[in-house]
Every structure is written in structure tokens, then in C-alpha cells.
Regions:
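A detector for short, charged/polar N-terminal pre-domain segments
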Residues: 1-4
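Short basic helix-loop element that most often maps to the first helix and adjoining turn
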Residues: 7-22, 26, 51
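Short, charged recognition helix plus adjacent turn
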Residues: 42, 61-71
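DNA major-groove recognition helix of helix-turn-helix/homeodomain DNA-binding modules
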Residues: 47-63
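Recognition helix of helix-turn-helix/homeodomain-like DNA-binding domains
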Residues: 28-42
């Protein structure tokens, strides 16, 4: 299942004119990891996700959630 994160990484990779192999080499993660990330795998190591995102000037961090009113 595609996620916001997987779509973002794929869009940015294409915007930077990188192949999956080039992205994996530049970020220091394996090709399999890049493929899993772009395919929306739900269990990924956060440190490796950040290794990829740093190439685009981003990183994953805590974000305050909006809570829905109950009632």
C-alpha cells in the first residue's frame, strides 16, 4: 500500500533524476530498503528512513496529532 512517505520519496527521487540504485548508494542504504520504502512497507527502520530523507533535506520526527472530539 502506498503511503504519503513512499509517494514523497519516489517523487523526490524522480525530481532529483536518481535511480533507485543511485538513491541507495547516496543514502547508504540497500537497494531492497529503497524498494520497500517506495512500495509502502509498513515496518521499516526509522534510522534508515532518515538516511534517505536527509538527501532531500528532511527527516521523520514527532508531530503532534489532532485529537477528534468525542461527543
Amino acid at each position: 500500500m502506498k503511503t504519503v512517505l513512499s509517494k514523497y520519496v519516489k517523487e523526490m527521487r524522480k525530481q532529483y533524476h536518481l535511480t533507485q540504485v543511485e538513491l541507495s548508494e547516496k543514502s547508504g542504504v540497500g537497494l531492497r530498503f529503497v524498494r520497500d520504502l517506495e512500495q509502502g512497507k509498513t515496518t521499516l527502520r526509522l534510522d534508515k528512513v532518515n538516511d534517505v530523507l536527509r538527501l532531500f533535506g528532511m527527516e521523520v520526527g514527532p508531530v503532534k496529532m489532532q485529537m477528534e472530539d468525542e461527543g
